[in-house]
Swiss-Prot record:
Organism: Arabidopsis thaliana
Protein family membership: Belongs to the ORC1 family.
Protein name per the record: Origin of replication complex subunit 1B
Tissues and organs where the protein is expressed, per its UniProt entry: Follow a cell-cycle regulation with a peak at the G1/S-phase. Mostly expressed in flower buds, and, to a lower exent, in roots, leaves and stems.
UniProt-annotated stretches for the region Histone H3 binding: 163-187, 203-207, 319-324
Domain of life: Eukaryota
Motif (Nuclear localization signal): 83-90
Length: 813
């Protein structure tokens, strides 16, 4: 195949920070219809920028075999599978100095992959890479997140055409610096003076050229299109080549240099024109509209022609005079599911959230690569100076677990217009949604989890193991496991730990316990099926050892939070999940998390035996640990007095030891202090003091429902205490009246209180249900009536712990 010489240097258009949405929340859509593009947000294009296009109003998709654009591109890929020629070093040799003219370098090694579906290239040896955030290449600066034109190898002749900086007028076929207007239909450029009648200025609103108006009126037979002068060669712009399918557009996801041969590469995330989608170009598609895909490819930087600019609808509507290389992107297109997804409007973030639905997982590409930390060096290429920047992709390792999937939403300008005070920084840092940089006070537990997982996946056989993690709420069980998995992911990228696949499931998100089969199978295979079919396929994989794809060869780590919610009448769900790791070659590691300590003892013997003896207890935090957690969050922020932090820590440690409650009290105390300082401008103490913490505690623990608990009858207090005690014993939020009545009888007998009887207890439970202190079913179910606390158990403990009439209640709370 003929190679394409590099295009001449072209000045990159001005880049804007809001080039395109930096992060997307992706999930295959259930519909395959092309979504409508709202005209209110993306008006039709009209501008005075220099544009040109042949007057062609065809709206049909690109012709391909079977009218399927993806099948058509498959024919192209057959020509790309030839073995690549070895690349040459871009650094010029210093030993030879001759005056002979240099020959143009052939770029047979350039292999931009089809944006329909990338071909995963198997690597035969490990390659060392140096990653960058920004490089200067051919006197043009490229950085992660830029949008660029990319050469299309299968039609290399189109890339060799001249790229005019100023396009020709569609009437006089001359290019000059006079103002031109763009037709919103055909995107053709016209001089104002060449129009009939001529225009003195660019009109407001939509503008359609006279030729398009004639075509729309149905009189195309009488249309006399202008013809270029004889010998005049019409040069197409990059925009025309892209929209006609002769070029590709991509977003730079990574930048690196191969240390072995010195060639610079990028990871490109492809854009797609509407004609290349399954629906083709629809009437509602704008002429400059592109779709961001979930398809990636690694290509050499020599394939890049120059910058373009892909904008969100809001920025696109303001880009009337930003040049010809401006495009709109409002939707993402899943090339595997052939579905559309509206892009979330996010700002300057990494595009990491698409890892769940990428057809080409990143670990499949980078597991064999040995990444190197970037050193200070001046890089030079054959084209010119190439400068490096510190950081790059090396700073983004291990980034797909847990709450790190959550993106940063766009902050309004009025919020960012002033400098944050210390109290405002403290309030933002103490939010429960804020992920801490480090996790203090749990290093011992994290080391034990790490050694357990490494020991489970390091063996080639990987027979499978189970670990049960338990502890009261708010003790850091889940976040500790997620932090361990994040660190292990970084070690996988470095090559010190063998690759694995990780599946995280929360029992609270399951409609029924059996749905966990469908969730596991979908996470492993990407296909959504019913739970019975999923159970059959999972049995074939874990029990019978059938392997389907490459992912099946990797060990699987399954994290199940709220494990106790999977308990059914016959306990078959837990039995199946815990039985799989015992099978030969299952390569399954199960981590179960629950609040109750003795859950294995409450299960059937066949299940508790499979759960194993590997258990890890997360005890409640004491006041010293809570103080360290809060101080770590507030590191570098001088907003709290030390006595205020200590007071909040001791108060929470005496009740429950819940770190989340301590953080919430401190955050509320910061809000109280901020209000106090705004009210009293002359206040000398600008920090959060003990009085602010006390006010926050009183506000939190003196809510109306707590006052109701304090004022109920003695038997009602015993009833609530029995419900809390039953919750601590079983770890189940939901219980039955039969169990609560049995617990009340035991408590009364132990402490010398007269048992009131079942009928009176039933009436007490119904009365508490009417007050909405508890949630209960109708009373006619009697012993089988289901009960559940409507508020946290900590609130019940706080309300009843210091009761003077029944001081022994504190022993059960």
């Amino acid at each position: 195949m003929a190679s394409t010489p590099r295009a001449k240097t072209f000045k990159s258009p001005t880049k804007t920070p809001s080039n395109i949405y930096r992060k997307s929340y992706l999930s295959p859509s259930s519909t395959s219809h092309t979504p409508q593009t709202p005209e209110t947000h993306t008006p039709l294009r009209r501008s005075a920028r220099h544009v040109s296009r042949k007057i062609d109003l065809g709206n049909d998709p690109i012709d391909a075999p079977g009218n399927d654009p993806i099948e058509g591109m498959n024919l192209i890929r057959k020509r790309e599978r030839a073995p690549r020629k070895p690349t040459t070093d871009v650094v010029p040799s210093k030993s030879k100095k001759t005056e002979t003219p240099k020959k143009k370098k052939k770029i047979d090694s350039f292999t931009p992959v089809s944006p329909i579906r990338s071909e995963t290239i198997k690597k035969t040896k490990k390659k060392k890479r140096v990653y960058y955030n920004k490089v200067e290449f051919d006197e043009t600066e490229f950085e992660i997140g830029d949008d660029v034109y990319v050469k299309r190898r299968e039609d290399s002749n189109s890339d060799e055409e001249e790229d005019p900086e100023i396009e020709d007028c569609q009437i006089c076929f001359k290019s000059d610096t006079n103002i031109m207007i763009e037709c919103d239909d055909c995107l053709g450029g016209f001089h104002l003076k060449c129009l009939k009648p001529p225009l003195k200025e660019v009109p407001e609103g939509d503008w359609i050229c006279q030729f398009c108006e004639v075509k729309k009126s149905g009189q195309s037979q009488t249309l006399d299109l202008p013809k270029p002068p004889e010998g005049k060669k019409l040069a197409r712009t990059m925009r025309e080549k892209l929209l006609s399918g002769d070029l590709w557009a991509a977003r730079i996801d990574k930048l690196w240099k191969e240390v072995d041969d010195g060639v610079y590469w990028i990871r490109a995330r492809w854009y797609m024109i509407p004609e290349e989608t399954v629906s083709g170009r629809q009437p509602h598609n704008l002429k400059r509209e592109l779709y961001l895909t979930n398809d990636f490819a690694d290509i050499e930087m020599e394939c890049i022609l120059r910058h373009c600019s892909v904008k969100c609808p809001k920025e696109f509507s303001k880009a009337s005079n930003d040049g010809d290389d401006v495009f709109l992107c409002e939707y993402e297109y899943d090339v595997h599911w052939r579905s559309f997804k509206r892009l979330a409007e996010l700002a300057d973030g990494d595009s990491d959230s698409d890892q769940e639905w990428n057809g080409r997982k990143e670990e499949e590409v980078d597991d064999s690569d040995e990444e190197m930390e970037l050193d200070d060096e001046v890089l030079k290429s054959k084209r010119g100076g190439l400068t490096s920047a510190r950081g790059g992709a090396n700073s983004r390792k291990g980034r797909f677990f847990g709450v790190e999937k959550v993106g940063m939403k766009l902050i309004p300008e009025h919020v960012r217009c002033h400098k944050q005070s210390e109290l405002e920084k403290a309030k933002a840092t103490l939010l429960l949604a804020t992920r801490p940089k480090s996790l203090p006070c749990r290093s011992k537990e994290m080391e034990e989890i790490t050694s357990f997982i490494k020991g489970s996946i390091s063996d080639d056989q990987c027979l499978g193991r189970c670990m049960y993690i338990h502890g009261v709420p708010g003790t850091g069980k889940t976040i500790s496991v997620l932090s361990v998995m994040k660190n292990l992911k970084a070690e996988v990228e470095e090559g010190s730990v063998s690759p694995y696949c990780f599946v995280e499931i929360n029992g609270l998100k399951l409609a029924s316990p059996e749905n966990i089969y469908s969730v596991i199978y979908e996470a492993l295979s990407g296909h959504r099926v019913g739970w019975k079919k999923a159970l059959q396929c999972l049995n074939e994989r874990f029990a019978e050892g059938k392997r389907i794809g490459k992912e099946d060869e990797k060990p699987c780590i399954l994290l199940i939070d709220e494990l106790d919610l999977l308990v059914t009448r016959n306990q078959s769900v837990l039995y199946n999940i815990l039985d799989w790791p015992t099978k030969p070659n299952s390569k399954l590691v199960v981590l179960g998390i629950a609040n109750t300590m003795d859950l294995p003892e409450k299960l059937l013997p066949r299940i508790s035996s499979r759960m194993g003896i590997q258990r890890l207890c997360f005890g409640p935090y004491n006041h010293t640990q809570l103080q360290e957690i809060i101080s770590t969050r507030l590191n570098g922020i001088d907003a709290f007095e030390k006595t205020a932090i200590e007071f909040a820590s001791r108060k929470v440690a005496a009740i429950s030891g819940d770190a989340r409650r301590a953080l919430e009290i401190c955050r509320r105390a910061a809000e109280v202090a901020d209000h106090r300082l705004n009210t009293n401008k002359s206040a000398k103490n600008q920090l959060v003091i003990m009085a602010d913490v006390e006010a926050a505690i009183q506000e939190m623990f003196q809510a109306p429902h707590i006052q109701v608990m304090k004022s109920v009858s003695k038997l009602s207090k015993i009833f609530l205490t029995a419900m809390v005690h039953e919750l601590y014993k079983t770890g189940m939020a939901e219980t039955t009246f039969d169990r609560v009545a049995t617990t009340v009888s035991s408590i009364c007998l132990t402490n010398g209180e007269a048992f009131p009887g079942w009928d009176i207890l039933l009436k007490i439970g119904c009365d508490l249900g009417e007050c909405r202190i508890i949630l209960c079913e109708p009373g006619e179910k009697h012993r089988l009536q289901k009960l559940q606390l409507n508020f946290p158990s900590d609130d019940v403990a706080f309300a009843l712990k210091d009761n003077k009439d029944l001081p022994w209640l504190a022993n059960y709370l």
